[in-house]
Amino acid sequence: MLPTSVSRSLYLKTFRSHLLRAPQIVLKRMSSSIDISKINSWNKEFQSDLTHQLATTVLKNYNADDALLNKTRLQKQDNRVFNTVVSTDSTPVTNQKSSGRCWLFAATNQLRLNVLSELNLKEFELSQAYLFFYDKLEKANYFLDQIVSSADQDIDSRLVQYLLAAPTEDGGQYSMFLNLVKKYGLIPKDLYGDLPYSTTASRKWNSLLTTKLREFAETLRTALKERSADDSIIVTLREQMQREIFRLMSLFMDIPPVQPNEQFTWEYVDKDKKIHTIKSTPLEFASKYAKLDPSTPVSLINDPRHPYGKLIKIDRLGNVLGGDAVIYLNVDNETLSKLVVKRLQNNKAVFFGSHTPKFMDKTTGVMDIELWNYPAIGYNLRQQKASRIRYHESLMTHAMLITGCHVDETSKLPLRYRVENSWGKDSGKDGLYVMTQKYFEEYCFQIVVDINELPKELASKFTSGKEEPIVLPIWDPMGALAK
């Protein structure tokens, strides 16, 4: 029977106190410190196991990746025959070097196929550095905007701490690429190439820029807390900060030689050794020669944590103020695979995001989840894809390009894919990799296709205006490619 009147208050206080202590009591019962005596017991047990003895002898004397590589499996999967490929060879092999610009390389490598075909070129690259310059400038400003919009949150909140952790990392998403191209266009790499200590090795530059942005964040948050700080003061501060950011950037990189609407002149020699001259603006070059219509690409992901057929938005992730948000449509793996085949059949390469370098042999250029014989040493992996994402074991880390696949005649699904990476010709086989279907299902997360390549029921998810997206926080693994 519950206590009444006078004793009820005392009872409730006692009950609440018990609830507060209960978790600590339970945790204490479940805690387990290392028992030294068990260490000897475990060691005797393992040393009596001949398989363990063999494994430890090998692993203490040889590199684990070399020792456990299943060469029989490797030979079987290293098949470079593909019955569905894009018709234009993508040359030369690109190299992002010591930078996190994979998304810019994958996206520009996709579009350069159109330029190669349109202008009858043997080799061509779009300027990744041109986009990189403006991405840094825009990201810095985007960061300042996020600091202002989160000023009501405590400095120790997860959001503010996440923002401060890496204000202008090199990474990005395809929608962020589109934001840049819509505003700044594209130019040939001949007009604006990489620099050895900024674009190709960005760590120091990022460090100095990050330090200055954190200083600016404190200034803005302090000003916003003062009652006297009206909107005009904040705007003035931000303009001063934008100027200083641009000054810092100009120390590390040349200012792009042409404005988005300014005409440039580019001379080139085609496959037939004929000389041509093009006069174009960056914005015109993107549409006329790279054939990019920014309104058509859409992103699809496979994230088994969430229902399929639903839109997923990554909150606060972006680079250009007023640009498009990062939004995906979540679908099953079979749908992703079929869309890849359809796009390749339309002679278009596929931008995709994966967890790299999981189960990737960089020497031979093979991506396969059974490439290393971990079960031979008793190391068995049991987590499913959804659990790996939830427990931070798997996330989207790298963007590459699918330029071909081998389709099974019976299932009409790919058996393997031809992947173009951006780590130079010494990675893989001349820069190319083979990715198995099982790898695609387990470690591929995103593909980009044109909306007109989708079935009507999927395309309508993007166009109907009736779909309310699932909103994930900026630190979610599905946004990790932008780190």
UniProtKB/Swiss-Prot annotation:
The active site is at C102, H398, N421. Transmembrane segments: none annotated. The keyword Hydrolase applies. Gene3D superfamilies: Cysteine proteinases (3.90.70.10). One of its GO terms (molecular function) is cysteine-type aminopeptidase activity. The N-terminus of isoform Cytoplasmic is blocked. Its main location: mitochondrion. Pfam families: Peptidase_C1_2 (PF03051). It is found in: Mitochondrion; Cytoplasm. It is an enzyme of class 3 (hydrolase). It catalyses: Inactivates bleomycin B2 (a cytotoxic glycometallopeptide) by hydrolysis of a carboxyamide bond of beta-aminoalanine, but also shows general aminopeptidase activity. The specificity varies somewhat with source, but amino acid arylamides of Met, Leu and Ala are preferred. Residues 483 form a propeptide. PROSITE patterns: THIOL_PROTEASE_CYS, THIOL_PROTEASE_HIS. GO terms for cellular component: mitochondrion. GO terms for biological process: homocysteine catabolic process; proteolysis; response to toxic substance. Inhibited by E64, a specific inhibitor of cysteine proteases, N-ethylmaleimide, iodacetamide, and mercury and zinc ions. Its EC number is 3.4.22.40. Homohexamer. Binds to nucleic acids. Binds single-stranded DNA and RNA with higher affinity than double-stranded DNA. Belongs to the peptidase C1 family. This is Cysteine proteinase 1, mitochondrial. The gene is LAP3.
